[in-house]
C-alpha cells in the first residue's frame, strides 16, 4: 500500500474478548486502504495461569507471556499493520482470559 496523500478518516476504537479455549482469535483485520495502530492490549487471567502470545499475520510480536491466575498484563508497545494483516491473540492454555485492545484505524478509501 502506498503512503496516503489524500483525505481520510482516523477513528479510535476498542474491542474486547472473553476467551477460554487454547486457540488463536482474530481480533482486528485491516482491510483495503486501512492502516491500524494498536495502542494498548490488556490481558486479565480470570481462570488458572495462562501463557499468551500476540501476532500480526503469522509473525509473533509477543510470545508465550506468562500471566498468573488473577493477574493482568498490559502491552503498551505500539504496533502498526496494513491491509491484509490480522492482529491476533493466542492462548496457550484453556483457561479464561479477558482481553481488551484499543487501536486507531486510518481509512484512506
What do these predicted regions represent?
Residues 72-78:
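Exposed aromatic-hydrophobic patches
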Residues 64, 78-79:
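Short, surface-exposed secondary-structure edge patches
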Residues 65-72:
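Short proline/glycine- and polar residue-rich coil/turn motifs
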Residues 39-44, 87-89:
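Buried hydrophobic-core signal for structured, non-transmembrane domains
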Residues 1-34, 40, 91-109:
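C-terminal interaction-tip segments
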Residues 79-96:
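Noncatalytic modules at the cell exterior or secretory-pathway interfaces
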Residues 47-65:
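Short, surface-exposed beta-strand/strand-loop-strand elements in extracellular ectodomains
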Amino acid at each position: 500500500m502506498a503512503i496516503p496523500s489524500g483525505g481520510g478518516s482516523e477513528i479510535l476504537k476498542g474491542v474486547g474478548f472473553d476467551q477460554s479455549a487454547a486457540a488463536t482469535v482474530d481480533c482486528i483485520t485491516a482491510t483495503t486502504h486501512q492502516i491500524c495502530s494498536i495502542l494498548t492490549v490488556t490481558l486479565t487471567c480470570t481462570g488458572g495461569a495462562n501463557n499468551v502470545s500476540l501476532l500480526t499475520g503469522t509473525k509473533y510480536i509477543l510470545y508465550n507471556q506468562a500471566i498468573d491466575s488473577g493477574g493482568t498484563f498490559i502491552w503498551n508497545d505500539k504496533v502498526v499493520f496494513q491491509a491484509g494483516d490480522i492482529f491476533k491473540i493466542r492462548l496457550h492454555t484453556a483457561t479464561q482470559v479477558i482481553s481488551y485492545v484499543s487501536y486507531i484505524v486510518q481509512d484512506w478509501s
